[in-house]
């Protein structure tokens, strides 16, 4: 067995296409369009590299990652050849090879679909720690009772500064900017504000896809000074009612990031339920000692 760095995009794509991906992290980050996946693989080849396990001149597994911030990476893989058993020891060697030349403050992130993928032994062997869970939650019916919520209003430009600060503080990576949200507002894009005592205490951004007959609560948050006061739940209830009352849709859904499953279950009271969830892990080089690569 040998660890070999790969540079041929066609070879990498071909292996991934025919591989077993039951333990592949961030599988949903692989673009469906060929030109987009070429860009991702090209970036990965440049840094930190695409690495493979080879036996008898045949590729048995591949792992790669891409940067989303300085020294922060999302790991895609491992992709494993059919009829090949990837041991935890071999995975550890493969992963250490990819990370060995990175600075001490480098962070490698993993994401696996709970209940579908196998990941625990791999995360344990490299000493990756649990980070959080992304829950994808949906509702398919409106609330049975109408809820009067006088504190919730459509967006008003007088609250732009407060909204902008709250949004950028809450969503730091790969999110629409406050101005992008403003520019998008129309019959199918709505921004609702929770205002009390003249202060913005929360907001929710709703996006309607009429072709797919679905609505996404793309962003929602409450101000840190007013957490645990039910503001988020009032916004969600309002959006749920608004979407089903005004559009012909099948479901309303949103994603929420949390470590507390009990908190997530509170959404059941609004008719939401967990559709699927992604478990997130992170590997921090500085927290793991003796990262020498086995000969």
Spans of model-derived segments:
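Short amphipathic alpha-helix that is part of the acyltransferase structural core
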Residues: 1-34, 145-175, 293-295
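Glycine/small-residue-rich hydrophobic helix-like segments
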Residues: 182-247
């Amino acid at each position: 067995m040998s660890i070999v760095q790969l540079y041929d995009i066609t070879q990498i794509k071909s292996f991934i296409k025919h591989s077993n991906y039951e333990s592949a992290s961030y599988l949903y980050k692989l673009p469906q369009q060929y030109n987009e996946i070429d860009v991702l693989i090209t970036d990965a080849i440049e840094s930190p590299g695409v690495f493979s396990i080879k036996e008898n001149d045949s590729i048995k597994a591949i792992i790669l990652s891409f940067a989303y911030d300085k020294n922060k990476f999302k790991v895609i893989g491992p992709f494993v050849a059919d009829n090949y058993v990837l041991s935890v020891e071999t995975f550890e060697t493969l992963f250490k090879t990819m990370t060995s030349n990175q600075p001490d403050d480098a962070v490698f992130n993993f994401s696996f679909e709970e209940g579908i993928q196998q990941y625990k032994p791999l995360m344990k062997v490299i000493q990756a720690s649990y980070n959080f869970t992304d829950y994808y939650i949906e509702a398919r019916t409106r609330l049975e009772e109408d809820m009067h919520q006088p504190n919730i209003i459509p967006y008003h430009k007088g609250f732009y500064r407060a909204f902008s600060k709250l949004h950028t503080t809450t969503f730091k990576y790969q999110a629409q900017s406050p101005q992008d949200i403003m520019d998008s507002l129309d019959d199918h894009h709505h921004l609702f504000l929770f205002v009390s005592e003249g202060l913005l205490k929360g907001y929710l951004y709703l996006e309607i896809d009429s072709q797919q007959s679905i609505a996404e609560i793309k962003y929602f948050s409450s101000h840190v000074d007013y957490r645990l006061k039910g503001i988020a739940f009032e916004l969600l209830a309002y959006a749920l009612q608004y979407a089903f009352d005004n559009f012909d849709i099948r479901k309303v859904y949103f994603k929420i990031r949390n470590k507390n499953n009990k908190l997530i279950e509170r959404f059941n009271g609004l008719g939401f339920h967990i559709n699927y969830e992604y478990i997130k892990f992170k590997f921090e080089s500085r927290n793991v000692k003796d990262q020498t690569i086995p000969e």
